């Protein structure tokens, strides 16, 4: 992978490709929006993923979302010498199918509690512009699957939920995370948030 790539291979992906494919993701529970859409989803995924994991995890588990470390050979410029780009390029060369699997970075999915039965969940994924997720000129997504874990509770626990819901409604505290854009002028050494 250390040799320069030929000019025939012109399409590669950015790092953390799975999360870069979507500009925003919204979640509704029983028709109530709990994770509003925002164009900051890929940035949130980067900020929650990269500082959290060390090099060993990035080089193993994060390859499931197409993370390959950028490298440059000293004194050379461009994508052709970047080993990480070469790895990602080889994954999709000749229109190969790529399977990626990782959790979505949304407030609801960072909670430790399960949803109750009969709660309708809608997830809307909006695609990013190609120039944001791809390093090249063309692309096509063939198929996307969303895997959801389902937990089977014991009958005693379900009955306890039913009895509790007869007296009060359920409330789920959700920890909210906001990602905002701001501009820092060039040469500015102080920044107040």
For each feature predicted by the language model, list its residue ranges.
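Short, low-complexity Pro/Thr/Gly
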Residues: 1-193
């Amino acid at each position: 992978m250390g040799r320069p790539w030929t000019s025939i291979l012109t399409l590669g992906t950015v790092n953390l490709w799975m999360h870069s494919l979507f500009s925003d993701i919204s979640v509704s529970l029983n028709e109530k929006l709990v994770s509003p859409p925002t164009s900051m989803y890929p940035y949130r995924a980067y900020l929650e993923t990269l500082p959290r994991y060390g090099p060993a995890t990035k080089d193993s588990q994060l390859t499931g979302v197409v993370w390959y470390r950028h490298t440059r050979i000293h004194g050379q410029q461009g994508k052709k010498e970047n080993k990480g780009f070469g790895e990602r390029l080889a994954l999709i060369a000749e229109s190969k199918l790529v399977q990626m699997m990782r959790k979505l970075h949304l407030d609801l999915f960072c909670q430790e509690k399960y949803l109750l039965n009969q709660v309708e969940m809608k997830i809307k994924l909006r695609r990013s512009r190609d120039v944001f997720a791809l390093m090249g000129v063309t692309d096509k997504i063939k198929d996307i699957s969303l895997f959801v874990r389902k937990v089977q509770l014991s009958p005693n626990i379900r009955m306890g939920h039913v009895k509790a819901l007869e007296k009060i409604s359920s409330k789920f505290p959700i920890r909210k995370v906001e990602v905002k854009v701001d501009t820092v002028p060039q040469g500015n050494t102080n920044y107040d948030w």
